Amino acid sequence: HTAIIAGFLISFLGGSRVQIGGPTGAFMIIVYGIVTEFGVNGLILATIMAGIIMILMGLMKMGSVIKYIPYPITTGFTSGIALTIFSSQINDFFGLGIESIPPEFINKWGAYIGAFSNIDFSTTIVGLLALAIILVWPKINKRIPGALIALIVTSAIVSIFNMEVATIGSKFGELSSKLPEMNIPAFDLNQIKMLIPPAFTIAILGSIESLLSAVVSDGMIGSKHRSNMELIAQGVANIASGLFGGIPATGAIARTVANIKNGGRTPVAGMVHAITLLLIMLLFMPLAKMVPLASLAAVLIVVAYNM
């Protein structure tokens, strides 16, 4: 829901031509901490408050400070996100079966090492097949993304041969095919006071991640983003996400890079991305449940490598 609602608004209103917005892995530790302390309602309210802060930051022209961030920081940020994405896919790619993965990087790899004897070879074969298709397909046809072909082919193979590998459906169960109704969360003055620090955390980190993603995309396509407009768009998107029960959204550098690699050059690509997700949710959710998690992991591993 967040990727659909916030993603559309970020592309429609944003200051970057190719930015793809939505929830990101870099935010999951923050989200987890807020939910643990304040509950889901607290997270939703903090997301809305963060959106208001981001709009104010944009109106105050604070997006311009991005030009003072050194290039090594941008490179380090991108590499860090790539490493985070890669490390988050190991469990699904090898079928390790870890139910609860620690969010901390070192602890996460410790859990992987401890569970490596549980590698599921069927899952690994599916992941390797998806990886091979993604790498080879561009030599056959550059118009159709290799990731899409990989997901379709591996989903069909798993279904036809009734392979016992984890899929979106087996992990998440029945997926809702409806958008939630807009709802203003219950709140009081004391709750707002307690949520000011988390809201500022979401706003500051979301702004930095979005603007750094925009800088990276500028370097890839030779464009120049409008940083203050990007902050305003991010703020509007987070308010809308919260009102529909979503989580914080920001510029997603992995999806932005994937967008550029697949030929996206205008905001229309981001809007089509959001509409496509909506259509999948409304029309093809039963088919989406068939997608192997190992195949999704392969797609994200390639995205991380390309970053």
Question: What spans do the regions from the language model cover?
Answer:
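Transmembrane helical cores of multi-pass ion-transport proteins
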Residues: 1-307
